[in-house]
Amino acid sequence: MKTFKELEFNKFKHNIIGCKSKMIFENGYGISVVRFKSKCGFFSSYTSNESEWEIAVLKGTKEKWDICYTTEITDDVIGHLSEEEVTDIMIKIQKL
């Protein structure tokens, strides 16, 4: 199973401070993991420090995907997660 440590993060463009990663799994579901803050220093994602993450469940392919709001995992994005909690959710997504 894929874990947080296997995610590859990239910086946001357009003056957003933070990073993002996306991974699509073999079952057609995936995960988006982000953390960002505004230029004035306030966190804009569902995080409150640099050790928390926000995730969304994805459905699709690497080229074309959408946020999926209809899984048993969540019907929204989930914030304030540790790396370990992100890994736990990644494993659940891979088992869908």
Predicted regions, residues:
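Catalytic phosphate/metal-binding cores of nucleic-acid and nucleotide-processing enzymes, i.e., regions
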Residues: 1-96
